[in-house]
């Protein structure tokens, strides 16, 4: 599979996505569209919507190739630093907003940037798009670590996570909630755990280490994952679920997956003996996404399919985005 074929797969809308978006009125704007998921989500929205409904993708666009590719697929791109209030004020109106901006890696070294990106920036955006349906990308890291026996954290669990990054993500949610209360903005908090693209993600991290003969740390002993195409579809479909007070939705796969088991599976598929380091801790970051399955149906790509495709990608020298997830972090430091 080529990168072009992979992007087509990740941006392929489901029938449900097409039906959902076509029932909603107005244009759609993706804020923070230049990250790992943004380009394929914007392309999926473009593929799902009629031609007369515009899709905007807003980012600083450090990569010009990403911008050119989006334009080639009918997405209107806008270069903008979302921390600049005047620039945000000049963005086009849209009835539907997918907010994907945020900062994670490097929090330990520059916490002030993380707090600016995850708490100040949301205030600027929420004020600008106060009447739009808004899906806010969040993370399962806002929860406390939990046991595998619990089945994962649920949407109404108390937020008591480890680490400064996680608290900045709670701040993002609180800011959007404040503006939802003040303005009646229909909002959904999209708490996502580990989207999988063959070029990055937990599965790529584990598979590449097994392939290269590097140790796999199993201290964070269990994880949840979901195919990025399914996560994109669920995010777009969640626009129809946005409400006031804001709705919270955990989004990930059904399985609570052993990292040791993953390493063994990749060892079998790649004909390598995995090197295991560490010992599984009693607690891990795990989400219970049963509500998303009830509301949005099943995923289109199974765990087995993701594992097989990732092994093939790594074995055949597929490119990497060079962005490890650092899922192994058990103290919340990134």
List the model feature ranges, each with a label:
Residues 39, 64, 69-117:
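NAD(P)H-binding glycine-rich loop region in Rossmannoid oxidoreductase-like domains
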Residues 2-21, 303-334:
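Amphipathic terminal alpha-helices
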Residues 58-63:
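N-terminal Rossmann-fold cofactor-binding loop
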Residues 214, 221, 234-289, 331-332:
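Mid/C-terminal beta-alpha module of Rossmann-like enzyme folds, strongest
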Residues 29-46:
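N-terminal Rossmann NAD(P)H-binding glycine-rich loop of SDR-like oxidoreductase domains
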Residues 162-164, 170-230, 266:
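NAD(P)-dependent short-chain dehydrogenase/reductase
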Residues 112-116, 120-121, 142, 147-189:
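Catalytic helix-loop patch of NAD(P)-dependent Rossmann-fold dehydrogenases
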């Amino acid at each position: 599979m080529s990168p072009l074929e992979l992007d087509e797969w990740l941006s392929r809308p489901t029938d449900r996505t097409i039906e959902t978006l076509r029932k909603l009125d107005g244009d759609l704007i993706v804020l923070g569209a230049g990250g790992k998921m943004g380009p394929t989500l914007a392309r999926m929205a473009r593929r799902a919507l009629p031609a007369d409904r515009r899709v905007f993708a807003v980012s600083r666009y450090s990569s010009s190739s990403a911008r050119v590719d989006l334009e080639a697929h009918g997405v209107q791109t806008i270069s903008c630093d979302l921390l600049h209030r005047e620039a945000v004020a000049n963005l086009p109106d849209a009835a539907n907003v997918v907010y994907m901006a945020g900062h994670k890696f490097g929090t330990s070294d520059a916490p002030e940037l993380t707090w600016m990106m995850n708490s100040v920036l949301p205030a600027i955006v929420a004020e600008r798009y106060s009447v739009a349906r808004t899906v806010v990308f969040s993370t399962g890291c806002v929860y406390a670590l939990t046991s595998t026996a619990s089945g994962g954290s649920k949407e109404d669990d108390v937020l008591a996570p480890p680490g400064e990054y996680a608290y900045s993500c709670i701040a993002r949610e609180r800011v959007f909630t404040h503006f939802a209360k003040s303005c009646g903005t229909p909002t959904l908090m999209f708490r996502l755990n580990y989207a999988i693209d063959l070029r990055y993600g937990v599965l790529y991290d584990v598979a590449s280490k097994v392939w290269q003969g590097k140790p796999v740390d199993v201290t964070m002993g269990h994880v949840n994952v979901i195919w990025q195409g399914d996560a994109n579809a669920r995010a777009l479909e969640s626009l129809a679920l946005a409400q006031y007070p804001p709705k919270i939705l955990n989004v990930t796969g059904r399985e609570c997956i052993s990292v040791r088991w993953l390493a063994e599976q990749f060892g079998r598929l790649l004909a390598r003996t995995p090197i295991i380091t560490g010992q599984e801790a009693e607690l891990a970051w795990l989400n219970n996404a049963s509500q998303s399955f009830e509301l949005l149906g099943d995923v289109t790509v199974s765990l087995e399919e993701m594992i097989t495709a990732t092994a093939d990608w790594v074995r055949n020298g597929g490119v990497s985005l060079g962005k490890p997830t650092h899922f192994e972090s058990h103290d919340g430091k990134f």
